[in-house]
Amino acid sequence: MNFTKLFVVFAVVLVAFAGQSEAGWRKRVFKPVEKFGQRVRDAGVQGIAIAQQGANVLATARGGPPQQG
């Protein structure tokens, strides 16, 4: 019985402190990772656009219609 009460009190205290904690270390660790992911995404989108333009130029040079994308 005492163990159950102790466990409940410990769980409540743990939730109270965990819920109010600041995300300082997580922010320091994951912010650069998030920025890196955004740069990779943006570079991929830009690379696809450049490849599509190159395909359009090639198709125009060959005399066909440009590719739709």
UniProtKB/Swiss-Prot annotation:
Supply the alphabetized keyword list. Answer: Amidation, Antibiotic, Antimicrobial, Immunity, Innate immunity, Secreted, Signal
One of its GO biological process terms is: innate immune response
InterPro entries per UniProt: Cecropin_insect
Gene Ontology, cellular component aspect: extracellular region; extracellular space
According to UniProt, the tissues expressing it are described as: Following bacterial infection, expressed in fat body, trachea and muscle.
Intracellular or extracellular location(s): Secreted
Q: Which residues carry this modification: Glutamine amide?
A: 68
- State what induces this protein: By bacterial infection.
Question: What is the predominant subcellular site recorded for this chain?
Answer: secreted
Function according to Swiss-Prot or TrEMBL? Antimicrobial peptide active against Gram-negative bacteria E.coli KCCM 11234 (MIC<=1.03 uM), E.aerogenes KCCM 12177 (MIC<=2.07 uM) and P.aeruginosa KCCM 11328 (MIC<=2.07 uM). Not active against various Gram-positive bacteria at concentrations up to 4.14 uM.
**Could you tell me what this protein is called?**
Cecropin-like peptide 1
Q: Which organism is it from?
A: Hermetia illucens (Black soldier fly)
Source lineage: Eukaryota, Metazoa, Ecdysozoa, Arthropoda, Hexapoda
